[in-house]
Amino acid sequence: MDQDPRKDNPVEMDVDRDDSSQDPDDNESFKSALDEPLDLKELYQDALEKPSEEPSEELNDQVSTPAALTARAYQLEMFEASLKQNIIVALFSDRVMVADGHWQWQDSGRIWFLTPTVALARQQHRVLQSQIPSVKAIMLCGQDGVDSWSEQAVWDAVLLNVRIVVSTYQILFDANAHSFVRLDSLSLIVIDEAHNCSGSHPIARLMTEAYLPAKKAGLPVPSILGLTASPLKSNNLADIEKLEQVLDAVCRTPTIHREELLAHVNRPEMLVVSYGDSGTDPTPTDLMTRFLEAYHRLDISKDPDVLLLKAQRTERAREKLRQMITKKDTLAQKELRGVYNRALLVRREIGPWAADYYLTRTVSHMLAELERGEPPAQHRYIGEALRSIPIPAISKEPIQLSPKVQTLLKVLASHQQDPVGIVFVKERVMVSIVTHIISTHPLTKDRYRTASMIGTASVPGKARNHMDMTKKEDMTSLEGFRLGRFNLLVATSVLEEGIDVPICNLVICFDEPSNIKSFIQRRGRAREVSSTLYLMVQNASSESATDWHNLERLMKERYEDEMRQNAELELLDDPRIGSYPVLEVESTGARMTIRDARSHLNHFCAKVSSRSRYLQKEPYFVIRQVNPDPASPGRRTLLQATVHLPASLAPDLRRHESLWTWTSEKLAIMDASFQAYKALYNAGLVNENLLPTKVSDFLADLGDDPGHIWVKTQFDPWPEVAYAWQESSSLYSRRLTVLVPGVENPLEFEFILPVPVPYMAPLKLWWNATSALTLITSPEMQEFRKQEGTSAGPDHSYALLAMAFAHRFPIQGRQYPIRLVSTRRKLDVDGIAALEFDPRLYESSPQPPLVRLVDGRNMPYFVTKILPSKPPVELISKPSTDHADLPENVPYVVCKPIGKAVGQFIPLDAAQDQDSWTPKNGKLYRKVLPSTQIRMDNFPAVFAQVGAVIPAFTRAVEMSLVAADLMYNRLGCLQLDNLPLITTALISSGSRGPTNYERLEFIGDTILKFCACLTASALFPNHHERLLSQWKDKLVNNVRLCRASRDFGLDEYIINSAASKKWRPKFVEDYMDEMKSPISAETRQMSSKMVADVVESLIGAAYMCGGMSKALECVALLLPTPKSSQFKWQEIELSRTQLFEFAPKDAILSKQLEPLEKAMDYTFNKKSLLIEAMTHPSCAGLGTNESCYERLEFLGDAILDVIVVKRLMAETGPNELAHNDMHEHLSSVVTADIMAFLAMEWVIMQTDINEIDPTNLDALGLLPSSQSRITPASLVSNKEDWPFWRFMRHNSPQVGATQTATIERYLTLRDEIRDAIWKHNTLPWALLARMGPQKFYSDIVESLIGAVWVDSGSWKACEDVLTQMGLLPLLDHLLETKAHVMHPNVELQILAPPNKRATRTEFVIISNKRGIISSGTEFLDEPSAVDDGLVSVEPYDDTPEHDEVFSCKLFVGGKQVADVTGAATKEEARVRAAEKGCLVIKAERKVWNEAKAAAKEDKGHNTENGDANADNGQSGEKEEVPDCRDADGDTVMN
């Protein structure tokens, strides 16, 4: 605990002080106040302050600019008392000043301010911020999502540097119970409205369960400061002592400065106003009668709630149905009944006009709600009843008002002062009506600016009443009241307690206060001098209303009666509840009592339940009676509860019983909930904070993806090579064969390095757009020793470089890191331009040399043709500037230069290709040179070609050396043997290298996902599918892969930069000079995804090298997990065996599933796996010990991906698929729509059925009954197909109804879908969307694959099942026909990226029944059928209304590009619009590209003319290309 300035030893002080050590004078002085002339209420309940400064005349000035609060003497007295011990300050609003003194005085520790309501918390936070701006204060409430803060790191981040926290009671209790906020981290707890802290109140429990035990144990605890207007809820002083014991504090009120306190107390004048008899006829109005008749006409048998329970056909559903019908307890019944009862109340209290006004507004509001959006079935059912009610026109002005309301209006009209007041109304429904009357009635509308307030509280988990017309604008109204926009507030009891409102001079109690506390709180609102409190009663002559003293006394008696009744009820509570065990976690201090268990269990079930929409997710309790204890008094019936948890959990965790027997259902349910939660904790599904387990409890959350990060610069192998050239005594050599297009005999070189020469895959170095040199290194490597004192043999690298580059920059005679030695002829720089030009050589030699322009630079050219004389300048594309001066009658050569871009790893484009020039516009020759200005090399031109590609070859060698260093050092333990594969795994596409890692990354991603899913499933057999999905996401997400890559040191091996266009050779001497300089740690910026991708590409490379086991070794090496995570990568077969052992033994296959096993041509070793694979969560629920398919589906999804990816990777040679094509095919064939269609197509068996002959009128019953008969001859034998999907076991009427509707759509669309796939070689996404299958169709496909693999461990067995099902044949067909498989939504995102303004897409979906129902950018990242759970996409089974059809407009960049109509579902409308939009965009883009190409060609023609005209002083005119940009300058669909 932080140092408390009140004493030098605060801990010792707190430990020593207990209940017995309290100063007896403290209590005595408090009690003595009761005996003095001033009544206790006047002392601490009516202490109503004036501002220390004179109030401003303008209300706005009073409330909008908070003045600095100045403490008065009696406030300082309370403050000083609070510094000595824990106290409960008994004042009204001045008590906040006492608390304010604490945080201005304390210099350490965190202070927690507690309030009963969010509104009061917001008010206190605002005051603290304005009065102490130097201290960071925050407010926490449920709207901040506090209930989802389930990690210590979140709480630590929120509370970082926070000195003051303001919250409601429950938030601190929960945070402490889960050990997120420990008591020793607080220096002070301030409890506003402290009189509430009794019984099971959260703060009473915090004190008794945590504070007092910690203090007794000698642990540091915070100080306590209670604030209240009235610690006394009755005239029993024992209540004060109880409150003091609970809060470990003593009650204090001013005794020394009491006179000053009284000077600031303004007691309002109280007037009792009688309104007499109600004076209104209680007979319902005509509209009320019609409403009641509509209610009685409702057929409860057609109520959606009833229909739902009838269809379930379970014991639980039947019992619930019986109670629902008996009590008329459906949602529709309750809502309509509530409306009518509220109308009766309004009729009685206000009058007939008000009742009709309320009903008219309510019915109109509900019908309007039904017209908007997509209401649930219950509200459509209500709407049918409401539409039958004729709504009359009613007067806008209030008429026929009750005497009670008329009295209220007269009181308001007669108030003398400038009114600032509150009207307190008991019922919520009355608030808005009374507000409307005051605002519109002639007596009051001009004088009162009226608003209403009913409170912001809501019941968690309770459905909102759609027919509740009460407004939720409370904070706006309250703020307007504070700022003076309103001068009258009509409110419920929400304004009684705590909330700060302006000083009022008028308070009216429209209804009698319910208890003494309510009366005192209302009276305290009238704090202005000469203020008035009006108490409206039916009969002013009653004894209770003679004067306010009698009224107060009567209310005390009533309140005491309530307390006595409550006390009697509490006596019925089982006293053993206090001795029930507590679940406490020693490591964190988190604890849970039996009182908390049910809320904890509900929260757990909501978090972990199956995402299926067909299941109830809350726990279900069954109560049973047990024999009463004969020895117990009265032999009361004892009860025990059994709780059943969702089917997502393992069978042994789904059923739990209460530990003890109880006398009430509530306590038995609490007991069962506690036992269930304890079992979940023991099973590891609840963490150390007693919250549902998350993977972040084991693996730390690494935060968000940063996008780009700084990593080490790429490893450079050349300094090591240079050093070896100087120091090593060994050399290494491989044979390098160069295949040159057009040259019959390949060239051969010795490729020599002073380090082991890496083996490289055949390397293509492109010479132009269509041809490339191919360099092949031999598999065999030779090692030999350098002879001491020699240069280690010939080196032709220098000559090769000089042939190609000496004309561009000087090639110095130094040692190049790579040594190439021709095996067939000697190469020397002296042979460059060594011979006179001889035209005969070009006619006879198959490999002629280069010619060079003798101009000092020896510019090299290839000779394409020899002319006998100088051609006219008009025939030359690029004539020399001195062409006219050149000799006429000498041979000329037509030539072309060596391109600067030759030797790239990818084909050259037209602009780079020197060979792509063709004669045009009458220009026959590109370049000509006279024979008098040229010389020839002394060796064929092909050697210069080899020299020209040395830069690219050097780059490829560098990549291999980088990969070799990684493979043989950091990855050495894996014993990988394919260096070219590892090299590929390190090269990004941005490097423009010979290969890139994208294909390997694709398969590595799939393998990693499989390993993660398998290992998590095996290690955590109790973890449900949602938790397993968290494991998978945590293990394979890019942030973790990026971190692992950097930790392992992969970042310096990633090759991501392209070669420089301004290449210059770097020699051994250069590297040696650099090594003499200090080495600095250089970094580079890189995409975090690229850093993560290399991990996956290496996993893919390991798989290609050694299969799944080698891949798993690589995964374990690159992605280690801490021991604390409880996760450890393990062998594939070990994990599979564990999963196999988890499956129940000796399960007997039902007759229903036997045909499926037989049709699969696979016999399960454990039948339970097939049963589990075909069991929907609705069938694995109450009363069964079976598991549902969710875990197997989770694993089967990963297995299916592996099988498909292996098939895609098998496409090699000319059929090899690019990374994008592989991704599109995988995404297409494993999408839920496709698998669902295949599940309907896969016929498992056929059964014989007999049907009535449709031509037999007799058998059809179309003849008179006396003549009608069915005979064997009347029947026709047929075969009925039993497709795969029919073998799914479920126990849900909704699932059955969905299957029926889906199969009808399937039968209608089947032929079209098959034709599109097998005849037109395309995937019909729109038709599949029209079919709209639910996700469970694809789930059983994946779960079946998972079951076969777990049972057999055979990939082939799984492939055989997929072949029978048709999935692999479909994939083969798509590959063979090169079908277009991309989903339209994905294609549209590529053609029109939604993140660019000019191509931003928007779908507008329109219903012929409901108008526009959705608008915005809506895509599916991966096309799939809709999950039958909590998903963000539109549900296919969201049943349209009768004859409802949909249309969709698609806008791209604000321009409409598609408009489709007649769609059966919203998803079909969206997909069809995307398809049409893609066609339109591609057509527009084609036109634009053609125009662009034509403009470019015209521009080239004018440029050539311009070159010719330049000699004449003219310039070529520039051709303008059409501007295809929008107003913002963005390119449109370019």
From Swiss-Prot:
Keywords linked to the UniProt accession: Antiviral defense, Antiviral protein, ATP-binding, Helicase, Hydrolase, Magnesium, Manganese, Metal-binding, Nucleotide-binding, Repeat, RNA-binding
Protein name according to UniProt: Dicer-like protein 2
Residue ranges annotated as motif DEAH box: 192-195
Domain Helicase C-terminal positions: 404-575
Site entry: Important for activity: 1335
Family that this chain belongs to: Belongs to the helicase family. Dicer subfamily.
EC number: 3.1.26.-, 3.6.4.-
Domain (RNase III): residue spans on this chain: 959-1107, 1153-1353
Designated gene of the protein: dcl-2
Function, as annotated: Dicer-like endonuclease involved in cleaving double-stranded RNA in the RNA interference (RNAi) pathway. Produces 21 to 25 bp dsRNAs (siRNAs) which target the selective destruction of homologous RNAs leading to sequence-specific suppression of gene expression, called post-transcriptional gene silencing (PTGS). Part of a broad host defense response against viral infection and transposons. Controls the expression of the non-LTR retrotransposon Tad in the African strain, Adiomopoume.
Sequence ranges of Basic and acidic residues compositional bias: 1-10, 1492-1504, 1516-1528
GO BP terms, alphabetized: defense response to virus; regulation of defense response to virus; siRNA processing
Binding-site residues, Mg(2+): 1193, 1339, 1342
Needed cofactors: Mg(2+); Mn(2+)
Bias kind Acidic residues: ranges: 11-27
